[in-house]
Structure formats: C-alpha cells, structure tokens
C-alpha cells in the first residue's frame, strides 16, 4: 500500500494540467480505479484482516483526494498568473465628461448690483418674504383703499376664522425691509434690499414671483441731486458705459414725495440694445424722496433726516443687459438655457476687474 501511495502522489506532483489530474483521479479513486478494486476485495478477507486493511485504504483514498485538490488549485493559480501576465487592459480611457454648473443670470445681476452699491457705501439688508400688511402697506403710506391691496394683486395668507393676528401677505416689494432697517439701525443709513417679491400677474414681462432691489439713503440735507448722481453712477457701472443720459419723469408712489420714474437714453438699432446713445428712451426704475410718514414709521424724526429711495427690477435689468427676450424663461429650469446664459460660479463681479466676464 505504501508503494501505491508513492506511485500516485508522484504522478500528482508531476501532473502538468487539469486533464492529467483527472486521469490520475480516475485511475486511483474512480469507480473502476485501483483503490476501488482493492476495497472490493475486503469482503474476501478475514475480519481481522478487514480491520487492518479497511482503515488503511480509506486513509490512502483521503490522502490522494487531498493531493488531487491541492494540485488542481495550484494549477488554477498558475493559469491565472499566466493570464494576468499575458493579457493587457487599457485603464487610461477618459472619464465621463461632467458639465460644470453655472450661475443663474438673476443671481449674477444681483451680485453685480451689490458690488456697485457696495462701492458707494451701501450695505445689504434682507427681510422676511411673508410679512404683515402693516410693513408691506401701512408703514409705506399705502392706504387701505389702494388698488395694490386688493386680493387680485396681492397674495394674502389664509387666516382661520377667529384668528386675531394681523393679516400677512407675500411681500409685493422689498420696501418693507427699509422700514425694518430704519427700526434696527436708525439714521444716517445707506442700505439696499435685494430679494424675491410676489404679485398676482403672469405674462411675457410679468411673473407671480420676481426679484427687486430697493435702495434707501437717509441723512441730513439729502436732496434729489444726490439721488440723480447715485442712479447715474449705478447705470454707467451696471451697463458698463462711459456716459449715460437719464430722464426723470414725474410720477406718483405713496412712499415717496416727490416721485419720479427714470428712463435711460438708448438705441435699438438692428434689434440690439445700446445704452447711452440713440433717440429712444427706456424705463428702468422708480425713485423719489422718502415720504415723511414713511421715515416716521421707521422710528426716525422726518424733521431732522431726509432721504431718497429707489426700486429696481433685477429680472428686467438682467433681460436688458444679457439679451434675454422672455422673463418666463428665468423660471423654466432648462439646463440648456442656463448653459447659454449662465455665468462662471467663482468669477465674482467687481468694479475693478469687471462685472460680467
């Protein structure tokens, strides 16, 4: 039996492939193998001989099976190593192209506005988008019968029956932030208030939600001349022109007196807007001297301090500067549109390096 063991273990050690291993298995431990034939002879032996030969044959069979399995695993590992040495995989293929995000034109316009007015000493203030009707209307000298307070123009928040809290609205302008700024900071004061506002209107040039920036300057002896200079410098910087002509038209806003709508001289030759030249006029904002009642509502003595205010539609200015024809496209969430009109997110505007590059 020792000779049989040495014979098959030697063959297993010299086997070069799985076919040779299988042939050895069949010859040694297969149904017709040499060890199987020897186990059939156990029945012809005496009980004493079987007690000795049986365990010895089983041990030999187990040892040969273990040697076969180990050799088979070794051959498989060797084959894998050879395949890894011979095969070549290109791992330098380019990665999937990932598009960079861009800054929305409204966000860009807001950053440009902020940069310009910051150079003039204005700080930025923000306020709640849901506000009481006192801040949105009463404090701004807008009487109860004014059309702007009608439900067809203003979004009122629902109040349950018996709710005694003051009515709340989605703010129709950012002017309420002026009142809150006066209450918080007092005078003198120079502040701009950019943000989203809401009105019940929807067409090519109006949306239920849009963006405004309000400006407020309070000090002793402020006049319309200060307002005119501020707006001229702003328009020149925003549209990046050396000279601009503004036209102030008398108007009426409850929160300013006197009030003026401001037009800029422009040209539409060839369908392209050119600021500061031509014979056309384009309305861009409303302005005026702050009404004494509004100053008083902010907790400041109107006999001591005067000021000017202005309101600018950020969306409208973005349309004019960037050549965007339809206001509604701002809110369509179209990535193709945003890739075309968007701006580099990290290219922050400033007056020295340029606003929109």
From Swiss-Prot:
Cofactor binding, note field: Binds 2 magnesium ions per tetramer.
Location(s), subcellular: Cytoplasm
Swiss-Prot/TrEMBL cofactor(s): Mg(2+)
Superkingdom field: Bacteria
Chief location: cytoplasm
InterPro entries: aa-tRNA-synth_II (IPR006195), aa-tRNA-synth_II/BPL/LPL (IPR045864), Phe-tRNA-synth_IIc_asu (IPR004529), Phe-tRNA_ligase_II_N (IPR004188), Phe_tRNA_ligase_alpha1_bac (IPR022911), Phenylalanyl-tRNA_Synthase (IPR002319), tRNA-bd_arm (IPR010978)
Class of this enzyme: ligase
GO cellular component: cytoplasm
This protein's record includes keyword Magnesium: yes
Record: residues binding Mg(2+): 257
Pfam families with a match to the protein in the record: Phe_tRNA-synt_N (PF02912), tRNA-synt_2d (PF01409)
Documented EC number(s): 6.1.1.20
Example of a GO MF term: tRNA binding
Catalytic activity, reaction form: tRNA(Phe) + L-phenylalanine + ATP = L-phenylalanyl-tRNA(Phe) + AMP + diphosphate + H(+)
A single GO BP: phenylalanyl-tRNA aminoacylation
Classification via CDD domains: PheRS_alpha_core
Alphabetic keyword roster: Aminoacyl-tRNA synthetase, ATP-binding, Cytoplasm, Ligase, Magnesium, Metal-binding, Nucleotide-binding, Protein biosynthesis
PROSITE patterns associated with the record: AA_TRNA_LIGASE_II (PS50862)
Protein family membership: Belongs to the class-II aminoacyl-tRNA synthetase family. Phe-tRNA synthetase alpha subunit type 1 subfamily.
Complex formation: Tetramer of two alpha and two beta subunits.
Protein name: Phenylalanine--tRNA ligase alpha subunit
Gene for this chain: pheS
